[in-house]
């Protein structure tokens, strides 16, 4: 038992020398509470808390530019038929106990903000 404990201690001690430094994501892009990644017309989109989102041509390199009005938190997007449903939460808060939560939804024919068919409707 003593040998086992010494061995475990030695492994734990030595593992400190072989751990890579963990760093936060640096550079662009940044998104908080990202939605499901969805493909639309050959591009990939994801949306985040506070509005806006990211677009990718290859699903790997992301740039800002996706549009989602309304602010709110923790959005998600799903394709249903020929349209996209975007749902996101909005909450009230404060010390007065007014913690009302609401789920909002928006529909769009495309997620490409450059398309003439782009435009959200509730």
Which residues make up each language-model segment?
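Carbohydrate-active catalytic/glycan-binding domains of CAZyme proteins
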Residues: 22-122
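Bacterial N-terminal signal peptides that target proteins for export
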Residues: 1-10
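Bacterial N-terminal signal peptides
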Residues: 9-20
